[in-house]
Amino acid sequence: MTKKKAFTPLPYLASIVFLPWWISFSFNKSLESWVIHWWNTSQPEAFLNDIQEKNVLEKFIELEELFLLDEMIKEYPKTHIQKFRIGIHKETIQLVKMHNEGHIHTFLQFSTNIISFAILSGYSILGNEELVVLNSWIREFLYNLSDTIKAFSILLLTDLCIGFHSPHGWELMIDFVYKDFGFSHNDQIISGLVSTFPVILDTIFKYWIFRYLNRVSPSLVVIYHSMND
């Protein structure tokens, strides 16, 4: 049983981390060409919602103004006006393709995230025994660490999550999650989450020290405060 506890959790933990990612990645790559073909053939006209249509029109107007400005400066003859119209047409098609690719990316990312969630849910439902062994293995590993190493690890983790330089890391992480789920970048929402998450984590962490660590390991709390000061 001791040997099982020592070696079984390692491949199981690796499968929890890498298996959902590998299956989702394979699913994404295998269906990408089919989804692109289906989207381009079944949705020839209505490919934008109101917000996206507004964004496309704004970009198109900006593009048209740039072309007109270029024509006014260079004073091209009528032959170049025709080239100008062709250029506008090509750029419009490019904008349509770009937004279609955004829709396809959102659909694929949403599907792969659902698959990853389903796999992790299957682990939690079907792998109760393995999770118990993994939990006991982690507890035993943490218990064997010295209080100094524990305090250093807690201090390092808190500085990374709620320290002075943590907002930039949170901004990158939230932006990555936004892109992973297919959402467009929004500075207001990201700045709001960046200013909120560290405060919530700091409150939870202080409560955890006060409620749990003071009761379980007072010496660890003393070492942590000494290192933090």
Swiss-Prot record:
Protein name according to UniProt: Potassium/proton antiporter CemA
Record's function text: Contributes to K(+)/H(+) antiport activity by supporting proton efflux to control proton extrusion and homeostasis in chloroplasts in a light-dependent manner to modulate photosynthesis. Prevents excessive induction of non-photochemical quenching (NPQ) under continuous-light conditions. Indirectly promotes efficient inorganic carbon uptake into chloroplasts.
Organism: Nandina domestica (Heavenly bamboo)
This protein's record includes keyword Plastid: yes
Reaction equation(s) it catalyzes: K(+)(in) + H(+)(out) = K(+)(out) + H(+)(in)
Gene: cemA
GO process terms (BP): potassium ion transport
Topology class, membrane: Multi-pass membrane protein
Keyword Transferase belongs to the record: no
